[in-house]
Every structure is written in structure tokens, then in C-alpha cells.
Amino acid sequence: MKLFFASGSPYARIVRVAVRELALDVEEVEVTLRDPNSSLLPYNPGGKVPTLQLDDGTILNESLLVLAYLDTQHGGRKLLPMDGADGWRTLSELGRAYAFLDAVTVWNRELRFGQSAPGVIALEKQRADRAADALEAAVAGGAYSGPIDAGQIVLGAALENFARRHKVWDWRMGRPHLSRFLDDIAARPSFAATVQPELNL
């Protein structure tokens, strides 16, 4: 298998963390984005990461689809358990973490490229604060705990992405449980090996 990624993408990082947690043999190829000459384009004309090429040439993109495929490639505990209450709990937590990541990634892009008026930016911050407050309460109540799973990986990648690449929003303020969650998960070897470069916004 071959995984195309960009070091600044939190979505690609989610998959790179999963590869390491599952101890899978995957070749990683770093590519450029927003580049008409990117080596990614023959594999994914949309130019998005992560993109996974299977051994038979099949192409998968979107991090959740790639996670689901990787989970079929090992015999251990699943990152996406699909049976019983644990499966639905994991999917619920995963959905909340992805919604959080998506919301702040849009805000981050708007700040970076100056695409929105101040009023829109203010609305994005309010949405991010609401989501972070809900996640703080969820973590305080015992969510995103236990053996590593996809929901924890996505939430950890999201929080560290914001900490390293979105400096205008201090999500840690008043959210000790989220802060502790990130400190703990960031210490895992899979996270330490895939740290994103910093970006000052």
C-alpha cells in the first residue's frame, strides 16, 4: 500500500497515526497541494489527501474511508468497532470529533487566505467555542477514553492541529479535560512521529 500525504494536513495525519497504531506496512509519500504539477494528481485528480493506493491499484481517499479499510488489514482490536454499544459509542464520538475538525479547518482556511468578513470570522469562533465546550464536557464525563480508537485519534489530531497551526484561538483556556486529553495522546509514539509543522495565524 502507498499513502500520499501532506505534512500540514490533519486529515492525512489521522491516517498516518492509524498506520502506526496498527503496525501496518504502508509506504508514505509526501506530496504538494494546490500545485498543478503535484505528483498526487495522477492518483487523485482532486488533489486531496489522504489518498491510499492499494496493492491492486485501487484508490481510496477521505480519511474515514481509509481508516475503515486499514481496519480490515489486521487481526487486533479495531479502531472502528462496529458491533454493539461500543461500536455506536465510537461512531458517535468519531462524528463529533470530525465535526469539530471540519469546523475549525474551515475557519483556519478563511484566516489564512482572507476569504471572509470579520462578522463571518466571529461566527466561526462562536461555533468552535460551542463545539470545544461540548467536547470538554464529554471528555470530563468519560468519553474518548479506554483503548485507542478512531474517535480519540481524530480528536487528538484536531486539537494538536489547532494548537500548532491556529494561534489566534486558545482552545485550552477553561478546558482542562481537553488539555489533559491532548497531552496524554500526544505522548503516544504514533503522534510523536507525525507532528505537524507549526503555522502562525
Model-inferred region functions:
Residues L52, L135, I153, I185-R188:
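Residue-level signal for nonpolar/aromatic packing positions in well-ordered secondary structure
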Residues L67, D71, L91, A132, ...:
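Non-transmembrane alpha-helical segments in soluble domains
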Residues M173-T194:
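C-terminal end-helix/capping segment
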Residues R77-M82, P147, W171, A192-Q196:
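Short, hydrophobic secondary-structure boundary micro-motifs
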Residues L199-L201:
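Carbohydrate-binding/catalytic loop surfaces
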Residues M1-G119:
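GST-like domain detector, emphasizing the conserved glutathione-binding G-site
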Residues A97-R180:
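GST-like fold's C-terminal all-alpha helical module
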